[in-house]
Amino acid sequence: MGFVDFFETYMVGSRVQFKQLDISDWLSLTPRLLILFGYFYLHSFFTAINQFLQFINTNSFCLRLHLLYDRFWSHVPIIGEYKIRLLSRALTYSKLKIIPTLDKVLEAIEIWFQLHLVEMTFEKKKNVQIFITEGSDDLNFFKDSKFQTTLMICNHRSVNDYTLINYLFLKSCPTKFYTKWEFLQKLRKGEDLAEWPQLKFLGWGKMFNFPRLDLLKNIFFKDETLALSSNELRDILERQNNQAITIFPEVNIMSLELSIIQRKLHQDFPFVINFYNLLYPRFKNFTTLMAAFSSIKNIKRKKNRNNIIKEARYLFHRELDKLVHKSMKMESSKVSDKTTPPMIVDNSYLLTKKEEISSGKPKVVRINPYIYDVTIIYYRVKYTDSGHDHTNGDLRLHKGYQLEQISPTIFEMIQPEMESENNIKDKDPIVVMVNVKKHQIQPLLAYNDESLEKWLENRWIEKDRLIESLQKNIKIETK
């Protein structure tokens, strides 16, 4: 996805929406945009330092220089031994103290960023109301007060889905997060910092919850269907703390244009189920993550076998990609698969160093017994005497109010509300409907990819019907 497309799709919306922003809108938006950019700048700065320190501690070339440095000073009398100890202590201190501290700082910046963004978009907005539908299951990430690695699957209606999932996650966690001052005080005193529950999103070949530079690079230059392998995912889960992981199987944000393209493609692929309120799910991230869970739990999976329906799905996805991204170069996804052969250093010193670095024991991964299926719909409530749905031809009016499904942009959601009550009333309110349904994960761990794909497809059929049902049965009470 190019920069212009990314900016229009995720940040400001269409050019028409962008032109509607006047000077007062920009004056109110600018301070908030600067705050968010400040988080991005600090995160990028500390990430650069962290990666540099990790590079000089683990890179084969740097280890070779370290060896040459030691050999040189070993021939210098008196001060040579001091120089060798000085570098060794500096590297050890950076590895054992500075890098873990920077990891905690980066973790804190990511959480404060999400807390601030949640506050800007959902928590303190009078014109934005979130409703959990009747019959929804509660999100539960803990067992015996211990956080569990939890999978959530969700439809994709807006870039604000990321913030909304963070909002639901934070509301479901009893953990108290440090303020910035408390965090700095604990760092200064050298006190142990408690592990915070983590939420990550799996997509674009990354696990993330912050707009990092490497993520933006993938968004701009690579295919959005890029996925991590099951071995890579297992390695991440065993190195990091237990975390909640959210997947958007649709990959792309649902829009009228993509819905029309999907319906046209369905005429050529009658084997593929047609959805009216969703995009057809992509399976790769889901199947590889489930394979990683199975590997962690030592559960043997059934073998895959070829079938016609699976091939039809892949052809459908390929044609959809071609239409949505006409200018995309398919070679971009191949670049990430190529690996540079490591520098081979025939020296026991280097081997010993590498063993010390990689000797960390894998962490215990506690997998939640449930998968949480989250459904999100955004509505704008408008007062009108008549209405027409250009997609389905049937738009219900609720006591003079029309419910319009929307995909709000970041600019639209972070824009502050004016203090005047008249200004608040003049704005059309946004209603967010959320449904949560849980499914047992244990039976799925033995499934092969085909069975997992079918399971996810069935969940999408249910989700499509649910959205249709919510649209018809929603009621607006007026005073």
Swiss-Prot record:
A cellular component term, taken from the record's GO annotations: endomembrane system
Glycosylated residue positions: N285
Membrane topology type: Single-pass membrane protein
GO biological process, one term: phosphatidylinositol acyl-chain remodeling
Main localization, broad class: membrane
Known function: Involved in the organization of the outer spore wall layers and especially in the assembly of the chitosan layer.
Name of protein: Protein MUM3
Organism: Saccharomyces cerevisiae (strain ATCC 204508 / S288c)
